[in-house]
């Protein structure tokens, strides 16, 4: 007759030890006797098997098997058969559920909008799996819905879940089984197993069971010779006791024995056997007790406090290294337990820095592995009709481009080119877009093509063709398929043609030979996961017809759930795991990280589809049990802590931090205070405080010691108090060949000041030439920051250009369109009519827009809309130009007038050369948007008009002019005055105005829109185009700028405001001609000074600060110069904003006259 036994006792009382001793004794007495089965959680099976393997008297076992529930069922089916259905993996089930959601979307009441999300099918799969574990069928769900009054949302929710659940069961019926279905069939077939009837079964490592597992235990108790269950409980069945969970499990086991009329034997374990000292015994015995006696701690329990999470992990790593060195412990004797996933990620990066071997007992998603990323990108390329982003991701995985040397470099060139040309869709297949000559036109600064660059461009084209050919073959194979099976076959055959299987296996072997066993294993699992997903699709959906889109969606769902299952790479390594899941029994040293409130105890929340209230109501009405609710789980938090800390036999270290990764404040766990209260002398060790008083505690590993040394030496250089130990450590490491490696790089960072080297004159000439031919903007760029000039014109770094409309593109368009129209009407805007404005605008745009960025403005609906907006802006601009011309005596004389030292035609203007202090010529070139002139008797006056599409840049700031940050307008005026004969101007030609015209889309704001009429609106629109800049204060010039000037008149076309007495108000922007000439002369001196500095080789990172702003904010070279306010602020040049530039120039002029 069967027996049901329960081994109960507190943690460390020897339950598992007694079980193993019993089994080993039986094995020694009769090695080939009746089977012995140990059922344990998956995480524990390897450890239990090792117990038998390591026993020298056994050397393994033929009689005893360590299995989890699912493996036991497979073992029985191997014996008796009966499982004819195909096994449906987790991925297969999720694919089925996703397909059901799409097929029955219209029948859903609540979740229609969620069906398109892959994550929702995973969530629904979890909920259905939960129902199966607790023996709830779709019929029971539907019955509950029909028989009970429910809130509408709850009713709709359960209806949708039941609907999907029922359809899933129908698809599985007679064809497939899930893991839960396998266990139900196992229960049905258990009676037929002769092997099981002879077996003695031990169940260890569990604290509670699901309804399905209880049913298995009940059936095992009926069939097997004996069943013994080990539980960590003292038998206290108080619902609020520490052992609530396991005592509840014990009650269920007793009910099974009573229900089946089976002998039930309770064996209590009371003697502590695990703990090697009184500290841990007292901790286990008194934790969570209301009444306890305090004990004196003997140093086997530590509590560490750190400032932040990273330092907490570093402190634990240092302690492990110290114990390994001083106490001669092995890494396999150490376990680190955490609750917050943040710690797992940190340990993965920190522990290798300390050379600590470790194994983290978690499953990682395969999603981000390069091979998986390549597969998913390939799917997205097909689904998105060859979009840029997935295609470039495909290239960047380097999986399909392994055969190309420097494939990353070639991919970068390809990406730059494709970004600039806007290659997408079918353009990838058009050879005219991928010619070597086209590649050489790439970028803003084009360089002559060398043989080497030509060869590189050819390799880029070859690489692109190689990958595109593979995608085309893959796309063609999919296009010929129409069922799940044919799609899966096409998929695999395409990858076979890619030679991918052999490539990956070769790579795996190379990784193994190089000692990178984990990476090799990951590669293996990724490929097997890929094949498994294809098999699942072919098996589950078979010959069912489906669209390519549906197949790719289902395939992506399958890939999404793939996870790595990594086995330990060595036996001597630190075990790392979650406090909730890790099975780490009898470790000598346990570290419990993250002992903060909110983590331990954790604020439990229900993340499932069904809320806790819905669960409780369901359980009350149906008398069926479901998975525990959040409030029940919350009651077990002390038990989680208890189980974790009692895994240690020698030492426990608790740690917590005062700040999280996001600098959020953290509170210590209340359990820490509870633990401290158990002892008379258990203090908290602040790691930072301890390190300050004894720096040697930080010096456990060379790499980490160097980092800490760097921080301490930095404090020392800043005249902060530093322990002598650090300076001694520095000297010791400096003179040790092994320890000094890398030290120089760290110490050089201490004195790093981002200082550049001044070029010698020969190198300057090699970079810039023996004369400077440059635009005005180049000199302005140097004045903003010398290093910016060095990178752009010395190193000639080429910033990436993109296939999109930039601000400078808009400016070029407006310049070209206005030049085209001005030439058509011979510069006379006054006679334009609304009809002629519309006609000329359309004609100009039709001629000019197709030339912009490879016809960018016709590439999409958005850019076609932008073309319409550009046309509207041009029409508004022409209306404003007509209005301004009507009231001005100045007439346009030239448009887009270029200038240089040696004009190539009579159309160009000549610019006199300047000379640096080294005698090098400065030849300035550029283009003046518009030159307006006014002739009066024997004098001519000149207006320089510059079109700006940015309102910010369309302001003449005389302070910036003085400092050489704004040199354009004075340069243009100087060039025009030099060329009065070429422009047929009078012998006496003087400045009229230096004015900016803001080309923009006008917007009108009214305080009271009810009072607005069309005339007022038009008036405000025209006023928004008012010219801005500086005007000659000569009365004749003022009258010519606006013929309507009179007292109390403020011009709406130029910056002139006349007062009541005919004088100019302060808001007028005017200066006499002598002042303008002084600015022109000062501007020339700025050119000479800047050019001289350039040829002297100045390259320093020294941006000029103006109005609390640095040019770095919009600089494209920040990633090159590494400008840092902490390091470089002392080198910033600052504009004196208190100066009056006009007064300062006049003062300098007076001083020159006195000399």
Swiss-Prot record:
Q: Which Pfam families match?
A: ADDB_N, PDDEXK_1, UvrD_C
Q: Which residues bind ATP?
A: 9-16
Please provide the record's keywords in A-Z order.
4Fe-4S, ATP-binding, DNA damage, DNA repair, DNA-binding, Exonuclease, Helicase, Hydrolase, Iron, Iron-sulfur, Metal-binding, Nuclease, Nucleotide-binding
How, per the record, is the cofactor bound? Binds 1 [4Fe-4S] cluster.
Task: List GO molecular-function terms, semicolon-separated.
Answer: 4 iron, 4 sulfur cluster binding; 5'-3' exonuclease activity; ATP binding; double-stranded DNA binding; helicase activity; metal ion binding
Which residue spans traverse the membrane? none
Show which residues constitute the signal peptide: none
Q: Which PROSITE patterns match?
A: UVRD_HELICASE_ATP_BIND (PS51198), UVRD_HELICASE_CTER (PS51217)
UvrD-like helicase ATP-binding domain: residues covered: 1-278
Question: GO annotations under biological process?
Answer: double-strand break repair via homologous recombination
User: Which InterPro entries does the UniProt entry name for this protein?
Assistant: ADDB_N (IPR049035), DNA_helicase_suAddB (IPR014140), DNA_helicase_UvrD-like_C (IPR014017), P-loop_NTPase (IPR027417), PDDEXK-like_dom_sf (IPR011604), PDDEXK_AddAB-type (IPR038726)
Cofactor dependency: Mg(2+); [4Fe-4S] cluster
How the protein assembles, per its UniProt entry?
Heterodimer of AddA and AddB.
Q: Could you tell me which HAMAP family the record lists for this protein? A: AddB_type1 (MF_01452)
Q: What does this protein do?
A: The heterodimer acts as both an ATP-dependent DNA helicase and an ATP-dependent, dual-direction single-stranded exonuclease. Recognizes the chi site generating a DNA molecule suitable for the initiation of homologous recombination. The AddB subunit has 5' -> 3' nuclease activity but not helicase activity.
> Which NCBIfam families is this protein grouped with?
addB_Gpos (TIGR02773)
Q: Which PANTHER family match?
A: RECBCD ENZYME SUBUNIT RECC
In the UniProt entry for this protein, what further remark is given in the free-text comments? Despite having conserved helicase domains, this subunit does not have helicase activity.
Family the UniProt entry places it in: Belongs to the helicase family. AddB/RexB type 1 subfamily.
Q: What is this protein called?
A: ATP-dependent helicase/deoxyribonuclease subunit B
Protein's organism = Staphylococcus carnosus (strain TM300)
Gene (UniProt): addB
């Amino acid at each position: 007759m069967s027996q049901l036994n329960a081994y109960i006792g507190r943690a460390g009382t020897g339950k598992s030890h007694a079980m193993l001793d019993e089994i080993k004794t039986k094995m020694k007495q009769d090695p080939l006797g009746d089977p012995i089965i140990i059922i344990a959680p998956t995480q524990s099976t390897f450890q239990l098997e090792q117990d038998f393997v390591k026993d020298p008297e056994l050397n393994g076992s033929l009689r005893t098997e360590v299995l989890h529930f699912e493996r036991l069922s497979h073992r029985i089916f191997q014996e008796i058969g009966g499982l004819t259905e195909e096994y449906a993996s987790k991925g297969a089930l999720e694919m089925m559920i996703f397909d059901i959601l799409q097929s029955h979307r219209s029948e859903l009441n609540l979740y229609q909008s969620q069906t398109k999300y892959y994550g929702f099918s995973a969530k629904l799969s979890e909920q259905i799996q939960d129902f199966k574990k607790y023996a709830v069928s779709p019929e029971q769900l539907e019955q509950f819905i029909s028989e009970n009054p429910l809130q509408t949302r709850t009713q709709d929710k359960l209806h949708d879940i039941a609907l999907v659940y029922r359809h899933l069961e129908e698809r599985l019926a007679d064809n497939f089984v899930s893991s839960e279905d396998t266990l139900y069939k196992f229960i049905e077939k258990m009676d037929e197993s002769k092997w099981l009837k002879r077996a003695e079964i031990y169940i260890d490592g569990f604290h509670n069971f699901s309804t399905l597992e209880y049913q298995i235990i009940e059936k095992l108790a009926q069939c097997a010779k004996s069943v013994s269950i080990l539980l960590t409980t003292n038998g206290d069945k108080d619902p609020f006791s520490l052992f609530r969970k396991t005592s509840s499990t014990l009650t269920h086991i007793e009910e099974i024995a009573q229900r089946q009329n089976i002998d039930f034997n309770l064996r209590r374990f009371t003697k502590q056997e695990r703990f090697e000292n009184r500290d841990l015994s007292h901790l286990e015995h008194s934790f969570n007790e209301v009444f306890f006696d305090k004990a004196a701690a003997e140093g086997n329990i530590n509590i560490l406090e750190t400032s932040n999470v990273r330092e907490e992990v570093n402190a634990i790593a240092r302690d492990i290294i110290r114990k390994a060195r001083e106490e001669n412990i092995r890494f396999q004797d150490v376990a680190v337990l955490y609750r917050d996933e943040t710690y797992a990620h940190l340990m993965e990066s920190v522990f290798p820095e300390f050379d600590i071997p470790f194994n983290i007992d978690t499953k990682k998603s395969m999603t981000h592995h390069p091979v998986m990323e390549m597969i998913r990108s390939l799917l997205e390329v097909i689904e998105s009709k060859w979009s840029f982003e997935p295609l470039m991701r495909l290239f960047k995985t380097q999986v399909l481009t392994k055969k190309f040397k420097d494939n990353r470099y070639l991919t970068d060139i390809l990406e730059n080119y494709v970004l600039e040309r806007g290659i997408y869709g079918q353009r990838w297949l058009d050879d005219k877009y991928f010619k070597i000559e086209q590649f050489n036109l790439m970028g803003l600064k084009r360089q002559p093509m060398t043989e080497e660059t030509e060869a590189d461009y050819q390799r880029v084209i070859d690489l692109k063709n190689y990958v595109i050919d593979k995608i085309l073959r893959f796309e063609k194979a999919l296009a010929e398929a129409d069922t799940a099976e044919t799609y899966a076959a096409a998929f695999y055959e395409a990858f076979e043609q890619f030679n991918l299987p052999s490539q990956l296996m070769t790579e795996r072997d190379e990784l193994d030979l190089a000692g990178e066993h984990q990476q090799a294993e990951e590669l293996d699992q990724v490929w097997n996961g890929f094949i498994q997903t294809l098999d699942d699709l072919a098996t589950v959906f078979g010959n069912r017809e489906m669209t390519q889109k549906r197949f790719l969606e289902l395939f992506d769902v399958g890939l999404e759930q793939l996870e790595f299952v990594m086995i330990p790479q060595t036996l001597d390594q630190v075990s790392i795991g979650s406090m909730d899941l890790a099975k780490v029994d009898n470790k000598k040293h346990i570290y419990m990280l993250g002992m903060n409130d909110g983590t331990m105890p954790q604020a439990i929340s229900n993340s499932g589809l069904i809320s806790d209230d819905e669960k409780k109501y369901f359980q009350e009405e149906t008398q069926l049990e479901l998975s525990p609710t959040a409030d029940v789980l919350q009651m077990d938090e002390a038990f989680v802590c208890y189980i974790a800390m009692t895994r240690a036999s020698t030492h426990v270290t608790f740690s917590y931090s005062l700040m999280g990764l996001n600098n959020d404040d953290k509170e210590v766990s209340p359990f820490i205070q509870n633990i401290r209260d158990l002892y008379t002398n258990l203090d908290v060790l602040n790691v930072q405080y301890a390190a300050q008083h004894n720096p040697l505690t930080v010096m456990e590993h060379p790499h980490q010691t160097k980092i800490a040394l760097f921080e301490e030496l930095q404090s020392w250089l800043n005249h902060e108090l530093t322990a002598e130990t650090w300076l001694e450590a520095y000297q010791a490491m400096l003179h040790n060949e092994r320890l000094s490696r890398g030290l120089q790089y760290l110490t050089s960072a201490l004195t790093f000041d981002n200082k550049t080297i001044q070029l010698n004159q020969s190198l300057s000439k090699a970079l810039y030439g023996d004369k400077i031919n440059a635009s005005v903007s180049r000199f302005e760029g140097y004045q903003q920051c010398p290093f910016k000039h060095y990178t752009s014109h010395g190193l000639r770094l080429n910033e990436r250009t993109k296939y999109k409309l930039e601000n400078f593109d808009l400016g070029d368009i407006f310049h070209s369109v206005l030049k085209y129209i001005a030439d058509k009407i011979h510069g006379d805007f006054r006679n334009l009519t609304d009809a002629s404005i519309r006609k000329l605008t359309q004609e100009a745009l039709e001629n000019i827009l197709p030339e912009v960025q490879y016809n960018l403005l016709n590439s999409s609906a958005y850019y076609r809309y932008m073309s319409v907006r550009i046309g509207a802006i041009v029409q508004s601009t022409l209306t404003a130009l007509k209005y301004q011309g009507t009231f001005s005596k100045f007439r346009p004389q030239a448009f887009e007038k270029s200038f240089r030292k040696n004009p190539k035609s009579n159309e160009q203007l000549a610019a006199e050369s300047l000379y640096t202090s080294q005698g090098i010529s400065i030849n300035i070139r550029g283009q003046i948007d518009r030159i307006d002139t006014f002739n009066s008797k024997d004098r001519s006056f000149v207006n320089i008009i510059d079109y700006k599409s940015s309102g910010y840049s369309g302001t003449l700031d005389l302070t910036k002019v003085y400092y050489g940050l704004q040199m354009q307008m004075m340069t243009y005026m100087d060039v025009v005055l030099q060329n009065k004969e070429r422009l047929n101007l009078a012998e006496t030609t003087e400045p009229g105005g230096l004015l900016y015209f803001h080309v923009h889309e006008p917007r009108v704001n009214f305080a009271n829109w009810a009072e607005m009429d069309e005339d007022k609106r038009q008036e405000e629109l025209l006023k928004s185009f008012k010219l801005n800049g500086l005007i000659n204060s000569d009365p004749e010039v003022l009258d010519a700028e606006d013929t309507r000037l009179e007292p109390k008149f403020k011009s709406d076309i130029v910056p002139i405001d006349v007062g009541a007495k005919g004088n100019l108000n302060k808001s007028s922007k005017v200066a006499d001609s002598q002042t303008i000439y002084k600015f022109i002369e000062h501007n020339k001196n700025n050119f000479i000074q800047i050019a001289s500095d350039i040829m002297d080789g100045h390259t320093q990172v020294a941006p000029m600060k103006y109005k609390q702003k640095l040019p770095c904010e919009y600089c494209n070279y920040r990633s090159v110069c590494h400008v840092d306010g902490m390091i470089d602020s002392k080198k910033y040049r600052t504009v004196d904003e208190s100066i009056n530039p006009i007064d300062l120039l006049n003062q300098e002029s007076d001083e020159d006259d006195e000399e």
